[in-house]
């Protein structure tokens, strides 16, 4: 067995982990998360955290969990500066010092990896943002014997960010959703990041996410997510950034979770409770595509990767009501940007040979499409006569006219007059043959 390493490998794929939801977690919860992540081909977790009084104890449990498992899996801290904008740099330095020499702490060029969420406007009393992070943070850590690889997530101009902020050794770009548009997400900004990271001999971490939807009183919007998982992965496979971060492992409040739902989590409540759009809406079946997409990225291929087992797979995602339906009992309005969603069932296919896919609800055929061998995607509308086709979707795999496999979706699609609460999250299933 190969010895464990703390070096974050080239083309590592890591997942964003929301430590703020782990107040009730035991070490066993973290161990389960790590084991599940390893089974999906992930190389590590990016531990996003704020300044909660209990946070250090939970971060310690996460690192302890990695030690106890003694498996190849890396961790690094991600300072959530949206929560810690007034925290002194000396406190942030202490956080990094606490875990810098742990056995599963990720390193690049033997330097401790540290990220942020925001922080691009904080100077810690220095003359500039660059000087602030350099003097009060990086230099302070270096004086304590800890050299870091600083890779913040700062939403700034990709064409100048590397040149303007040399304090960073690399950057992560957060935005991977189509913001307030019905057009598919673009990789134009990624290409600028990649070009400039190479020009400055630095690194770039791109991001991928399955969906975005949140439905709180003060935060109520969705982004066009139909087909996003496939589209974004295929972009990153083509573009080949240094690293990829999956957004997210466990953010239930924003529906971006790709890991199995852990009900020990402290589900966010802001007027409404995120249990309303997460319970029964597991994304785990979609997560089973992760090992395949990760291997495609690492092997730089848009065809079937080497870890494809030969068993064909159809991954299905869909919302349970039309974007135009009116909820009868929701105290919160329909989410902002709802109109840019698409009333379709999205599928991703990893198949050894071509086939025909037929999708129906209660005997009404919604669509029939020919799917080629390899890695493909398709969308089928669930609207019939200007309303959602109510019932449980049936997915049939046909060879000619012979059904060779079939499966139902996990949840009924609701008719336009049957929606009680809005939910723009999607449910998922997988069919194998």
From Swiss-Prot:
It comes from Schizosaccharomyces pombe (strain 972 / ATCC 24843) (Fission yeast). Its EC number is 3.2.1.59. Keywords: Cell cycle, Cell division, Glycosidase, Hydrolase. It is found in: Ascus epiplasm. One of its GO terms (cellular component) is ascus epiplasm. One of its GO terms (molecular function) is glucan endo-1,3-alpha-glucosidase activity. This is Ascus wall endo-1,3-alpha-glucanase. It is an enzyme of class 3 (hydrolase).
């Amino acid at each position: 067995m190969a010895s464990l390493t703390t070096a974050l490998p080239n083309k590592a794929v890591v997942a964003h982990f929301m430590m703020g939801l782990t107040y009730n977690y035991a070490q066993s919860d973290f161990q389960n998360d790590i084991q599940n992540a390893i089974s999906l081909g992930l190389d590590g977790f990016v531990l996003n955290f704020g300044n909660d009084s209990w946070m250090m104890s939970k971060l310690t449990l996460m690192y302890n969990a990695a030690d106890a498992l003694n498996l190849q899996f890396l961790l690094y801290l991600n300072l959530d500066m949206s929560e810690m904008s007034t925290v002194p740099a000396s406190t942030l330095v202490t956080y990094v010092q606490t875990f810098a020499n742990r056995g599963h702490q990720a390193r690049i060029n033997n330097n401790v990896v540290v990220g942020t969420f925001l922080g691009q406007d904080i100077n810690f009393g220095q003359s500039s943002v660059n000087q602030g992070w350099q003097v009060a943070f990086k230099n302070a850590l270096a004086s304590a014997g800890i050299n870091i690889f600083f890779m913040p997530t700062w939403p700034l101009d990709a064409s100048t960010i590397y040149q303007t902020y040399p304090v960073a050794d690399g950057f992560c770009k957060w935005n991977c959703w189509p913001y307030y548009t019905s057009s598919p997400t673009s990789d134009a900004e990624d290409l600028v990041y990649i070009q400039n990271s190479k020009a400055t001999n630095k690194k770039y971490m791109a991001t991928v996410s399955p969906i975005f939807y949140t439905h709180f009183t003060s935060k109520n919007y969705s982004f066009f997510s139909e087909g996003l998982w496939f589209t974004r992965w295929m972009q990153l496979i083509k573009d080949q950034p240094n690293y990829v971060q999956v957004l997210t492992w466990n953010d239930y409040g924003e529906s971006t979770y790709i890991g199995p739902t852990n009900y020990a989590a402290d589900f966010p409540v802001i007027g409404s409770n995120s249990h309303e759009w997460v319970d029964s809406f597991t994304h785990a079946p979609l997560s089973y595509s992760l090992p395949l997409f990760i291997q495609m990225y690492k092997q730089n291929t848009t065809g079937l990767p080497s870890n494809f087992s030969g068993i064909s797979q159809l991954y299905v995602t869909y919302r349970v009501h039309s974007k135009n339906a009116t909820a009868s009992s929701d105290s919160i309005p329909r989410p902002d940007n709802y109109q840019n969603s698409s009333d379709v069932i999205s599928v991703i296919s990893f198949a050894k040979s071509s086939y025909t896919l037929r999708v129906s609800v209660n005997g009404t055929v919604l669509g029939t499409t020919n799917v080629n061998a390899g890695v493909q995607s398709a969308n089928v509308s669930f609207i019939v006569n200007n309303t959602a086709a109510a019932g449980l979707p049936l997915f049939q795999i046909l060879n000619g006219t012979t059904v060779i496999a079939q499966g139902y979706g996990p949840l009924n699609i609701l008719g336009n007059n049957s929606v009680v609460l809005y939910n723009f999250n999607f449910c998922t299933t997988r069919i194998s043959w």
